[in-house]
């Protein structure tokens, strides 16, 4: 029998589903080789698609006017299975749009031919009973059976063709309905989105309107409170207005009274102006007289200082310090002056005994007394304030334009540094001449500012150690740097001397001066000697350059004030062995004695009016050249020790001071322009 293609096979050749179709029972006998997929596997494959398709109806419920397609007709089941079993059950009205689109876009697949049944297999009987097996020789019976079977197969094929046609019609209707439902669903979803957007917009507008209403209600409440407050304030302002009106009336009455008084005052002012002009003229005349009196005071002050001598010598004896032996009675005597004990002492008597001298009887010779007379002698009980009171007028001469030089001379440990700088601890009673002199200058300059004078002060502080000039105001990195300090003239043809690489610090108050003195005290060279635990081994020179100006009269003056603390010296026993430290002290002593000898030679040369004064023989005298000349005022403090062991050195110092006191260097000249 020629095998014919079944309509179901044609459908399978044109449509290939991704999921197995609904199993349909068939009455065709099974072929020799059964299909590989079992019915239960086909049902399992359909389950996900069924759930997805049915889920569409559960998720989105769409109401449509299209009629539903009737369900597929159930195909009666037969003993065998054919390719019609692969037709899907999801061809009803619930098929999704995805299945319909997949069916439409599938490419046709070649039809699978129906396998021929084996010759050994005999299909079952229609009644379910097995036909009896014919003998092999009954070919006619076998042919009849085959013809009957063929007839039944043709009838079943015809029935299946009809069923297949019905299924195809139902499938087309379902696909059309799915497509229409998909279109309608898309339209409804778009409409739903618009409606939802409009609803959300309406909700937002409603929310905004409610917030606006709340805000307006709050503003209304605030405005009502403000209106009440303004009404209250209006009442207060009306009360205040009535009060101000009454005050205005009172002010108008007082204004009329004031205008009358003003007229009287204007007449009085005119009279006062005339009187002021007269007073101004009188004040100008008084200022002229005051200026003349000030110049006369300066002249008389200078004349008084000249009468006292341009070189004056004061002697000061320091007190005995704790731990030192008490000097014998009569070692130092201070005879009274011509006016009796009330006059300040000006004489000093020193007693010296020489054990090498004796009488013919072998008894020691009586002590020898040495009498000295100076401009002023300060006993051990004299305080720092008493000492400064004697030199205050001399210091003030520096403001008048006269160069002034004050220096302390004496042996090591005689109190020179104490006299010039003061004692440690910052006790005001122990302040030396330098801080007291500057305080006095600042005070007098402040008083003279009322007469039109303005002063400026520039300080410098150097030491001369072994004929080397060092800056005592060097700080930080400036110490030991910048080269050696040298004494130079300020400019070509200038008589003013300056120290290179040294600091010149403007000062205007006591605190600045105290800071400079503290710094210099730390930098000064000191060493232990036989006479003093800390002995100054250098000459310290504090110089204050004073510049004054009277701008309205065009007057200028300027002069240096030099305050010098000379180095102390002591004699070394030549019989002692000199170690490294003693050799260094010996070189220092030689340099100190050399500079002090040069200072004495300079003073003697000035006193003798010699043509050549050896200023350059020593750095000390060269630096003080402008303060030692004929135009300067000079004061020498000779400091001596009260101890008996220092009598020899004290006697040498007093003899040197006595020679200086006998010198006269001429009349001082003020530096004025």
Curated annotation (Swiss-Prot):
Region (Disordered): 23-94, 109-136, 325-372
Keyword terms of this UniProt record: ATP-binding, Cell cycle, Cell division, Coiled coil, Cytoplasm, Cytoskeleton, Endosome, Microtubule, Mitosis, Motor protein, Nucleotide-binding, Nucleus, Phosphoprotein
SS bond list: none
GO molecular function: ATP binding; ATP hydrolysis activity; microtubule binding; microtubule motor activity
Keyword Electron transport part of the UniProt annotation: no
Modification Phosphoserine occurs at: 6, 26, 31, 33
Polar residues composition-biased segments: 60-86
Location of Phosphothreonine modifications: 359
GO cellular component, one term: early endosome
Family (UniProt): Belongs to the TRAFAC class myosin-kinesin ATPase superfamily. Kinesin family. NCD subfamily.
Protein name: Kinesin-like protein KIFC1
Biological classification of the source: Eukaryota, Metazoa, Chordata, Craniata, Vertebrata
Gene name of this polypeptide: KIFC1
């Amino acid at each position: 029998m020629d095998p014919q293609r079944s309509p179901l096979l044609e459908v399978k050749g044109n449509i290939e589903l991704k999921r197995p179709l609904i199993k349909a029972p068939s009455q065709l006998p099974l072929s020799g080789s059964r299909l590989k997929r079992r019915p239960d596997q086909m049902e399992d494959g359909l389950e996900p698609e069924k759930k997805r398709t049915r889920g569409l109806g559960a998720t989105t419920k769409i109401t449509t006017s299209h009629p539903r397609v009737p369900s597929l007709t159930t195909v009666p089941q037969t003993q065998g299975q054919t390719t019609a079993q692969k037709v899907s059950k999801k061809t009803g009205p619930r098929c999704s749009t995805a299945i319909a689109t997949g069916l439409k876009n599938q490419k046709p697949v070649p039809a699978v031919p129906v396998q021929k049944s084996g010759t050994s297999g005999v299909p079952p009987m229609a009644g379910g009973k097995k036909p009896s097996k014919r003998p092999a020789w009954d070919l006619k019976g076998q042919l009849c059976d085959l013809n009957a079977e063929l007839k039944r197969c043709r009838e079943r094929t015809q029935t299946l063709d009809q069923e297949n046609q019905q299924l195809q019609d139902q499938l087309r209707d379902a696909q059309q309905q799915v497509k229409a439902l998909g279109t309608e669903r898309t339209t409804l979803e778009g409409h739903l989105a618009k409606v939802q957007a409009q609803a959300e917009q309406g909700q937002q507008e409603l929310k905004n309107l409610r917030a606006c209403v709340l805000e307006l209600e709050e503003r209304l409440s605030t405005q009502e409170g403000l209106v009440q407050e303004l009404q209250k304030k209006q009442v207060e302002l009306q009360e205040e207005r009535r009060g101000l009106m009454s005050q205005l009336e009172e002010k108008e009455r007082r204004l009329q009274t004031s205008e009358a008084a003003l007229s009287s005052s204007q007449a009085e002012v005119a009279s006062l102006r005339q009187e002021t002009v007269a007073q101004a003229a009188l004040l100008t005349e008084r200022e002229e007289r005051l200026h003349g009196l000030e110049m006369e005071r300066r002249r008389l002050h200078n004349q008084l200082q000249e009468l006292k001598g341009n070189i004056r010598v004061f002697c000061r004896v320091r007190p005995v310090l704790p731990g030192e032996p008490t000097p014998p009675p009569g070692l130092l005597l201070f005879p009274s002056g011509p006016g009796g004990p009330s006059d300040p002492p000006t004489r000093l008597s020193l007693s010296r005994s020489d054990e090498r001298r004796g009488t013919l009887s072998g008894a020691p010779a009586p002590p020898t007394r040495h009498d000295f007379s100076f401009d002023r002698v300060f006993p051990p009980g004299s305080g720092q304030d008493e000492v400064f009171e004697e030199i205050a007028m001399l210091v003030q001469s520096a403001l008048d334009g006269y160069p002034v030089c004050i220096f302390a001379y004496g042996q090591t440990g005689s109190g020179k540094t104490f006299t010039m700088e003061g004692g440690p601890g910052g006790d005001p009673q122990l302040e030396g001449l330098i801080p007291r002199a500057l305080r006095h200058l600042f005070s007098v300059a402040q008083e003279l500012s009322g007469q039109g004078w303005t002063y400026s002060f520039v300080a410098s502080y150097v030491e001369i150690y072994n004929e080397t000039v060092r800056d005592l105001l060097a700080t930080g990195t400036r110490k030991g740097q910048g080269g050696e300090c040298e004494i130079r003239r300020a400019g070509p043809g200038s008589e003013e001397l300056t120290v290179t690489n040294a600091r010149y610090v403007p000062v205007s108050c006591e605190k600045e001066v105290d800071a400079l003195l503290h710094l210099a005290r730390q930098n000064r060279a000191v060493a232990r000697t036989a006479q003093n635990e800390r002995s100054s081994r250098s000459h310290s020179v504090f110089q204050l350059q004073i510049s004054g100006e009277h701008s309205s009269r065009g007057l200028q003056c300027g002069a240096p004030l030099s305050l010098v603390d000379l180095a102390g010296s002591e004699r070394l026993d030549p019989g002692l062995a000199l170690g490294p430290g003693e050799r260094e002290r010996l070189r220092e002593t030689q340099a100190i004695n050399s500079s002090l000898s040069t200072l004495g030679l300079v003073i003697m040369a000035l006193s003798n009016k010699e043509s050549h004064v050896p200023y350059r023989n020593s750095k000390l005298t060269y630096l003080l050249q402008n303060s030692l000349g004929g135009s300067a005022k000079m004061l020498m403090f000779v400091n001596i020790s009260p101890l008996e062991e220092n009598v020899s050195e004290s006697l040498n110092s007093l003899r040197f001071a006595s020679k200086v006191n006998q010198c006269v260097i001429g009349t001082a000249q003020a530096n004025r322009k």
